[in-house]
């Protein structure tokens, strides 16, 4: 007998699921996977523990679902790189999108960094396939532009790594950045023109 697809979630079910994932983000970003409990997640979500377990069978399931959701969000700007667009402007649009994500989603960025440093198996499993495939696609687009003389020739994957490092730093090390800059500085407003200038000089031909 063929499997039947699960019916779509109702509006209330989707709302509760989102509340659980937001609560899980708060808990995991402070305590990590090992230190987090279902009770803490339920409290952060404003739901009962049985209600949480209605939507997710275990802490494992919540963690995997949260990381998958974060990865989807994290990869979206890279997927939007258009091979038919202006090469330098496509790269700069990606840099701006990544910096904007660091501004708007600092907890998500820090959780991702924390889980990578901890070597969480869920993240290794998720990253090993989809992330590599999307990076391979972006690297192939960049390499094509370089081969055609539209961008300076550098190793495309390390270019991608440098974009990640130079944008996510402002979320992952926010306290350090603000302490060094001192009062009256907006790190993101100042980082935007700096990164634009840096990558244009690096890639311009």
Region spans (language model):
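Hydrophobic alpha-helical connector segments
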Residues: 79-108, 156-163, 192
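Amphipathic alpha-helical linker/stalk segments
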Residues: 7, 64-93, 135-144
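C-terminal peripheral helix-coil segments that are non-catalytic and often amphipathic
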Residues: 2-4, 100, 104, 132, ...
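Helix-turn-helix
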Residues: 19, 23, 27-61, 65
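Amphipathic alpha-helical segments used for helix-helix packing
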Residues: 103-125, 173-181
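N-terminal intrinsically disordered/low-complexity leader segments
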Residues: 1-15
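All-alpha amphipathic helical-bundle segments outside canonical DNA-binding/catalytic cores
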Residues: 89, 125-130, 146-162, 190
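Short alpha-helical scaffolding segments that buttress acidic/His motifs in well-ordered protein cores
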Residues: 95-98, 112-115, 163, 167, ...
